[in-house]
């Protein structure tokens, strides 16, 4: 019988010698104020009850704000951000980001890329004033919402709209 141990040890040594460039991470928050810092890969972070900070970095991140007043910063990839029940502050990144709001009075700032921002319920503020040649879409949902958008962008359901060129 031939022993496979030397072969397995050689494979393990090769795998350990190869540096890990990025490993996607999934993490869930607690009832405290949690901080999640992204990796270059596509991460998934879930805030919970505290006033959390969720920061994407690279890749297509999935960021879920919780019940607190959270700060969510999207990264360079095409990120999906879901607001929570608190008054969240969301800053879109460089990719074509998607945002779905929760029940609080959210502040949402679009970034570079063709962002789709849906604020949901609550009295929200949306700022999309970067002229990057991409068309952003803003749906303010219900509530008394304020939007500052570029003349190329699309908006619906926003009560107070300022268009800049």
Predicted regions and their residues:
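Alpha-helical transmembrane bundles and membrane-interface segments of multipass inner-membrane proteins
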Residues: 26-28, 32-34, 71, 80, ...
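Leucine-rich solenoid repeat scaffolds
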Residues: 128-165
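Bacterial N-terminal signal peptides
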Residues: 9-17
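Glycine-centered beta-turn/loop sites at beta-strand termini
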Residues: 29, 37-38, 46-47, 56, ...
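Consensus positions within tandem repeat domains that build extended binding/scaffold surfaces
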Residues: 33, 42, 51, 60-62, ...
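Sec/Tat signal peptide C-region and signal peptidase I cleavage site
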Residues: 20-26
């Amino acid at each position: 019988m031939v022993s496979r141990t030397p072969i397995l040890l050689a494979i393990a040594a090769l795998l350990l010698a190869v540096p890990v460039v990025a490993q996607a991470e999934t993490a869930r928050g607690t009832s405290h104020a949690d901080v999640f810092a992204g990796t270059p890969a596509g991460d998934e972070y879930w805030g919970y009850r505290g006033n959390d900070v969720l920061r994407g970095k690279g890749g297509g991140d999935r960021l879920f704000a919780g019940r607190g007043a959270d700060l969510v910063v999207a990264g360079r990839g095409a990120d999906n951000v879901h607001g929570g029940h608190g008054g969240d502050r969301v800053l879109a990144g460089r990719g074509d980001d998607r945002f779905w709001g929760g029940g609080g009075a959210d502040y949402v700032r679009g970034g570079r890329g063709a962002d789709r921002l849906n604020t949901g319920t609550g009295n929200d503020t949306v700022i999309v004033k970067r002229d990057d040649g991409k068309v952003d879409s803003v749906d303010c949902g219900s509530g008394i919402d304020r939007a500052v958008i570029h003349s190329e962008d699309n908006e619906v359901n926003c009560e107070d709209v300022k268009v800049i060129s």
